[in-house]
């Protein structure tokens, strides 16, 4: 493959980054995949699959592995960043000196900036400047199913109409992968952060043994919290009824492929936070997101009782069952008031 003819460079060779790279390559595009660990990239190249996360999915011939960041970024103007949210800013700053003059950045990272709770668009602007086109993809996607070619749908939002159209064309596959465009850049970002938090709560409820009624109540009221916060930030509330909101929320709250849900289940069964994280063995985005989302809600004066109780469990040692009872014992409310 020539150095500058790739349709996309993917930054991040974990399960989701690899799955997206495979999907793009399967669509007939030339793709470069880079990861921060050269030994890992060399292992992917030798096996022509991601044996750690997706061992049963071979790489298409048009998927190239690259250990050199400069060469990876020279290969395409389109750069897809798929890294944990707590390193998102650091990775963008690492990329900046190597980006092409015509570069465009899209991310599939879900979450907020660690400590500050800022939206990733603000982190990207600070790291990359005001002129580079930005985009985000988000929605109900488990890496294993996406990589296997199972039917999947996501949402896409961008600051640049041409970039959005190009991304939709690159990603969309009529056989398995449907990409919906959405003009709500804020809402598509926020949904992916809040759903991580609520998924921990849903898992915790199931771990305690509360059953389907309680899980459904948590999903429904979690969606209300997501919508309230999004509206306060200027998002379109209808976004949260779509793929980046309700879609992703239902997926992560109900299926054990979700690390956030499994983490919550372990807490509900009595495991401590550190042991549960160690048992998962991968990043549990919702753990950090809980603190970040709550800080953002407090900054905007938005009531988020589920998020607050989860913060009490994760960071203050509150018992999971006691947190659930605190929610049930709250003052009576009108369901649709300030939804």
Curated annotation (Swiss-Prot):
One GO term of the biological process aspect: glycerophospholipid biosynthetic process
Gene: gpsA
Coiled-coil regions listed: none
Keywords recorded for this protein, A-Z: Cytoplasm, Lipid biosynthesis, Lipid metabolism, NAD, NADP, Nucleotide-binding, Oxidoreductase, Phospholipid biosynthesis, Phospholipid metabolism
SUPFAM superfamilies: 6-phosphogluconate dehydrogenase C-terminal domain-like, NAD(P)-binding Rossmann-fold domains
Family of this protein: Belongs to the NAD-dependent glycerol-3-phosphate dehydrogenase family.
Chain's role: Catalyzes the reduction of the glycolytic intermediate dihydroxyacetone phosphate (DHAP) to sn-glycerol 3-phosphate (G3P), the key precursor for phospholipid synthesis.
Protein name: Glycerol-3-phosphate dehydrogenase [NAD(P)+]
Domain of life: Bacteria
Main location per the UniProt record: cytoplasm
One Pfam family named in its UniProt record: NAD_Gly3P_dh_N
Binding positions (NADPH): 15-16, 36, 110, 143, 259, 283, 285
Gene3D superfamilies in the cross-refs: N-(1-d-carboxylethyl)-l-norvaline Dehydrogenase, domain 2, NAD(P)-binding Rossmann-like Domain
Localization (cell): Cytoplasm
Originating species: Pectobacterium carotovorum subsp. carotovorum (strain PC1)
Pathway: Membrane lipid metabolism; glycerophospholipid metabolism
GO molecular function: glycerol-3-phosphate dehydrogenase [NAD(P)+] activity; NAD binding
